[in-house]
Amino acid sequence: MKRDIRRSTTAVATLLLTALPMPLLADHATPEEIHVTGEQSTNKLPLEIEPANIPVVDTSALLKRVPGANVNSNGPITGIAQYRGLYGDRVSIHIDHAPTLTGGPNAMDAPLTYTPPLLLKSLKVDRGIAPVSAAQESLGGHMTATLDRGEFGSSDEFEFSGALSSRFNDNSDGSSSALKSTLTNQHHKLSALYSHDEGNETRIDSDDEIGGTQYRRGRYDISYGWQNESSRIEIYTGELDTRDTGTPSLPMDINYIDGDTVGTNVSTTIGEMVLSGHLSYNHVDHLMDNFSQRTAPASLMSYRANNASAHNTAWSLQARWPMANGFLTVGSDGNETVHTATITNPNNAMFEVANFNDAERDTYGIFTEWEGDIGEWHVQTGARINRVKMDSESVGASGMMGMMAMNANMLATAFNNGDLDEDFTYLDLALNLSRPLNETTTLNMGLGRKNRAPSYQERYLWLPLAATGGLADGRNYIGNLDLDEETAHEITLGFDWQNGAAWVTPQVFYRRIDDYIQGVPSTNATANMLSTMMSGQAALMFDNVDAKMYGADMGYGYTLTETLRLEGNLSYVRGKRRDESDDLYRVAPLNNRLALIYEQHAVMLSLESVLYAKQNKVSDFNAEEKTSGYGIINLAGSYRLTRQLTFSGGVENLFDNRYQDHLAGYNRNADSDIAVGDRLTGPGRNIYLAATLHW
């Protein structure tokens, strides 16, 4: 299969998929396909996995197939994206071109939870240094997920099309189903999407289970689009409905997550200028507790429920027009968010803690970017100025007893008298360069300066708790009103090489981060006393430290015959503090994924090896445990019975190996065959079957 290097406008790695992972058949076009594609700056060399029957429930798990990317898993549908060792708020994620909103203080509704795999059209990861136009804060990279709402037709005649998908996973007795339908012509497009995922606890082997890994999620979406020769508009609204879902790495489980979204994307061409923009609103209600889906605390006074809510309004407007053998883009964007969370005890009506009280974080940005050719170089360069405004209402606690009440009141008073209103203003810069060295090799380079202001948890967590955006290290944290923004300076260097049947896309990077925010031992005696009463350990405090990260990743492949090929990706990252002799927390170990793929006519077979090295470079401050290396084998296959009907299936972890994923958290659910405090074990053998019908 021939792979051509072709011109592109951004440095991205793209994962394309629709209702069900299926092969791209060599002789026939099919509406279902999965690609993992690595792009370097301006020249694209694909890393295609065709097919890739990936029976994932959590979209974030797809990132393991992108060079440099991975996932921090806190539950069956609570994966937090990681890219080159950074994760959480440092990695920007957009859904349908709009910034995402995480409603809970522990990221139980992580951004990619809102895009079930069976409804996903594409997941795009900017490789290396993200353009300044891509996102407001992209210190750790940028990703864009797009739901599959269909395409406009080619005539005035209306056409009705769609897909019905169903999948069964043996390991958790899980099932996933999805319905996509579109009524369209060349000017109008009406789309409706529905999906449902449900499963029981994950089995490790024939005898053991991981307690608290059950899940149930529904997703609904309706959209309307209109276009003519020069303009396009799409309006959409959707809902996420998650119920009774476990998060064994966290102190509570999900009772429900009700997420509502509405938005619009517009573009129009005026002469040589293209104007585009988006407007979106999201609202999330989220209830979690520590007693309904795991062993309840021995004391009725230790029951806890946390009712969180959040909303955001986001917008962008940009103009793009030809200039100096390229294109100039100028734009502005904003994202205003508010978070509230209240902790209660169902056995004590007097107990109430204002975990967060209208914690505001508003980001406003302006940017300019030019992309074009200078001699043999293709250049993309830009600058962005962001202003982040943060504030919070007063907090407090009631219903506590004795010393605990006194300490909590002291912390609340100190917080309320602190400087809650804070502004951060900073400059981001990005430069990506690319040029061909010869017919087979393209050189890619990048330079960047990126910033990130503190999250609302990092500033406004006034009581020592584990509400940390999903860190899942088992420690209590306290916020810090004196935090500075993080500033990263990064350089990347790589090349794309293709010679006949072989291809490879290596890239190395070095990132120096000043004022990196992480937990350090708290010097607040009141917070430490209260944390020790609650957990037996003193608190960690968010603080600025200095860090560095470096590593390499690549995709590679080799075509053996017309029907047989090898494809894989390799990733390595190292994270260290520069001011102390310590390593950074929860960094993915060296890993490699290699697949042998047979594909002919309507048949596909795949044999995949997944290898992870041991991780002994761990964080002392987080008391992070080392993990051993492991390897598993996966099998996959599919058969297209007709042009409309495809069957697929496979076996994950064929030999039922027992292993620990270093990016999984530590178990906090006593209803499990894994001891409390031990790192969660990876899933055992999983047999899955699936079918998709198109019309």
Label every PLM stretch briefly.
Residues V57-L62, G79-Q82, H94, A110-T115, ...:
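N-terminal periplasmic accessory domains that precede
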Residues P99-G128:
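Short acidic/polar hinge/loop motifs at secondary-structure boundaries
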Residues T144, R149-F152, F158-G162, S172, ...:
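Periplasmic-side early beta-strands and strand-to-turn transitions of outer-membrane beta-barrels
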Residues G199-E201, D205-D207, G211-R217, S230-L275, ...:
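Flexible loop and strand-edge segments within Gram-negative outer membrane beta-barrel domains
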Residues D221, N306-Q318, T363-F367, I478-D484, ...:
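Outer membrane beta-barrel strand-and-loop segments of large Gram-negative receptors
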Residues D241, D285, V338-N345, K389-T413, ...:
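Surface-exposed extracellular loop regions of Gram-negative outer-membrane beta-barrel proteins
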Residues A324-G326, D373-V379, R387-V388, V504-T505, ...:
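Gram-negative outer-membrane beta-barrel transporters
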Residues R452, D514, A613-K617, S638-W695:
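C-terminal beta-signal and adjacent terminal beta-strands/loops
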